[in-house]
C-alpha cells in the first residue's frame, strides 16, 4: 500500500512539472504571437490610412473635374 502511494505521488509530481513546463512554453509562444499580431495590426492600419488618403485625393480630383464639366456645359464652352 505504501509503495502504491509513493508511485502515485511520484506520478503526480512528474505530471505537475511537465504541465508547468508546457504552460511556460505556451506563454512564450503567445508572447511571440502577440508581436506578430501587433505587426499585422500596424501594417493593416498603415494600409487603411493610405487607402483613405488615396480615396480623398481621388474624390477631390473627381469633384473638380465634375465641376469643370458642369461649368463647361452651362457656359457652352466645351
UniProtKB/Swiss-Prot annotation:
GO terms for cellular component: extracellular region. The lineage of its organism: Eukaryota, Metazoa, Chordata, Craniata, Vertebrata. Residues 1-22 form the signal peptide. Antimicrobial peptide. This is Esculentin-2Vb. Belongs to the frog skin active peptide (FSAP) family. Esculentin subfamily. Disulfide bonds join 72-78. Residues 23-39 form a propeptide. It is found in: Secreted. It comes from the Eukaryota.
Amino acid at each position: 500500500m505504501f509503495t502504491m502511494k509513493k508511485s502515485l505521488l511520484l506520478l503526480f509530481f512528474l505530471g505537475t512539472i511537465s504541465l508547468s513546463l508546457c504552460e511556460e512554453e505556451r506563454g512564450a509562444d503567445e508572447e511571440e504571437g502577440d508581436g506578430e499580431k501587433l505587426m499585422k495590426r500596424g501594417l493593416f492600419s498603415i494600409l487603411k490610412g493610405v487607402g483613405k488618403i488615396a480615396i480623398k485625393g481621388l474624390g477631390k480630383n473627381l469633384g473638380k473635374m465634375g465641376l469643370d464639366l458642369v461649368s463647361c456645359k452651362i457656359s457652352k464652352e466645351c
